[in-house]
Amino acid sequence: MVKEDERADGHLTAASSERPAYLDPQAPVGERIADLLGRMSMEEKVGQIMQLDAQNDLRSDILDKHVGSILHTSPKRLAEAAVLVRQTRLRIPLIVGEDCIHGYSFWPGATIFPSQLTMAGSWDPELIERSARVTAVEASATGVHWTFSPVLCIARDLRWGRVDETFGEDPFLIGEFASAMVRGYQGDGLDDPTAILACAKHFAGYSETQGGRDASEADISHRKLRSWFLPPFERVAREGCRTFMLGYQTTDGVPITLNEWLLNDVLRGEWGYEGMLITDWDNVGRMVWEQHIQPDYEHAAAAAVRAGNDLVMSTPGFFAGALAAIRDGLIQERDLDGPVSRVLRLKFELGLFENPRVPDAARIAAEIGAPDHTALNLEIARRSLVLLRNDGALPLMSAESAVPNAVKRIAVVGPLADDENNQLGDWAGGSGQVNWIDEEPTGTIVTVLQGLREEVPDGWNVSYAKGADILRLVPDPAGAAFADGQPRPPVQQACEPDPALLDEAVRASRQADATLAVVGDVIALTGEGRSTATLELFGAQNELLEKLCQESRATGKPLIVVLMAGKPLILPQCVHEVASAIIWAGNPGMQGGRALAELLLGKIEPKGRLPISFARHAGQQPTYYNQIRGQHGNRYADLTQEPAFVFGEGLSYSSVEYGPCTLSVVPGDGNDGDGALAGATAARGEESSQVPVAAVEDTIRIRVQLTNTGTRPASETVQVYIHDKITSVSWADKELKGYARVELEPGETRMAVVDIPVAWCSLVDTRERRVVEPGEFEALVGHSSKDQDLQALSFVVH
């Protein structure tokens, strides 16, 4: 058999009987890495730990800078990159990365799911895992090996532009959903050709901003990080997420890119993480041109290598800077061997040296937007919609509906009711991060208007009036480009009310039996670098809602309001006073309009629950439920502290009654203690008669009886929060530690069971240790995080 070898100039030949060890798929990965490292030049090592934007000079990046990875790669550039790699000396394959945040973002016709925040409304890790599996299957078919997802940031300041990318405000739920997404992406192992690398981001504390401003200083202590922000990352690190992305921000004056405590002491030390660390976009350059903590790219490159970064994203100046740093003795060439080895290990484990996984035309045709992927997308959209208010107007086809039983006429009003790309939200075809796709292909998205028209019975009439414009874009007065040459996006300017549009909307409402108003935000108002100072509806949307509320008051006809937005926005007071129903749709993805139509008509049941709280006013923040106890009073002088809608909230079309609750202890030896150990029992509103005692190695088991007292099927999400009554340090009043989703037919009674390891009932003490303190606890069981929705079961930890 003809084998490849290396010429004097390093190029592979087919003349020798021996092939290099790094090309032997039977050799251990460690041996292959060592062999290849020994063959690489200093320049090739520097390039190997660089990832550059494939929208730029791809030929120079691969042939001159020897880059190890590329991102934002168009279909045309993917094929070009494969050809260029074969022209390199060692033919080291590229890792191709892409921002597949909630679906395969930038391939025409690929599946775009609801946003992370919207999917979190399903409270269903299994569905989220399946969405990630679909994304991996589609992306891998096109030659993508890596997604920069999931996002594990905690959304606490709703002004922050990237709230939509998170799973919400609760660390426990974030860990549940992020873990599921990692499993979906990475599949059964990296040798599976449909697997792609997952990337946990943004490590860590990135969302703890100043004033909600993206990438601003995160004023956060080590103890606070350990308490709330690190646990989801620790979970996915220990479960095998192969890459981590480092946030833009500084913490305590040190950029995360250089934070040796986080990167080396915690991540690689305490957690034993062996995966690859990548900077976020131009983190190394930002130390020079934005944060001004390094004098030039030479010093910035040296600092990044010393701190333990493995791959430098989109800093072209790193190449010359790192070479200069080696030449001047700031770092040694051997300092590159660790990061280069970690990059190469992933390439070997992915099997890229044997199969570089270039675009596969047959798989692309079979997988991109496949019917089963669309069906899953619809199911996730259905499960994610959250019904927040309903006075009986919904469902529209119910005999009990407030809409007259004559011929149905529905007025669909609002600027987002028939807006395909803004329905998808950020990180999708029209969101502007890449230059080869302006919007998703027509026909792949079902808007609310389209969905209703397709789903209503024969004889119904669905009219449409836009009613308002949201914004217009104008050039940024600060200039056309940032300091690094990246173009500044245009700035948004709110549109004024248009009397003609308002009159058209009022006429449509007056002529209908019910009005559906679809309002929210647009891509220009959400995402990276797009934080907002307020949470109000932009443009003329508030004026539109005022007019529609006036009409509803005058006619008595139902007004249904749908909030389609990347983050929790504030609805005007008139909506809270007048609207018959309110639905949070988030960014519901390609099938969102159909799912919403089915919900409105009663073809499906509402099942979603809020993963995040809604403020009444931007100045009311923070509104997240798990705040530290201990303040004067429980309201502002001018406003309640109670959010408009709370974490965990969500209605069904039926009613579910909570019956008696019990708490028992399952011993740590695994034997079921039900019936064998004393347990706490409480009926609604009653105190428990016994207090179980548990050890740290035990599990508490909560059972609650649920009865569907309505005439329609119901889906109830039983939530269990832990309240540690006396703590050695200030701590949250309650934390979600478990939940169960229960389906109930009309009149059915079922028992829900939630198990919570006592070890989860922990806090972080003053020495930054996570511990379970002995003492009295309560398990708070109920429908949402509202105190009035919860019943308490006491237990003691010894």
Place the predicted regions along the sequence by residue.
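Glycoside hydrolase catalytic-domain context in secreted enzymes
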Residues: 1-669, 684-687, 692-765, 773-787, ...
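Intrinsically disordered, low-complexity regions enriched in glycine and serine
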Residues: 669-678
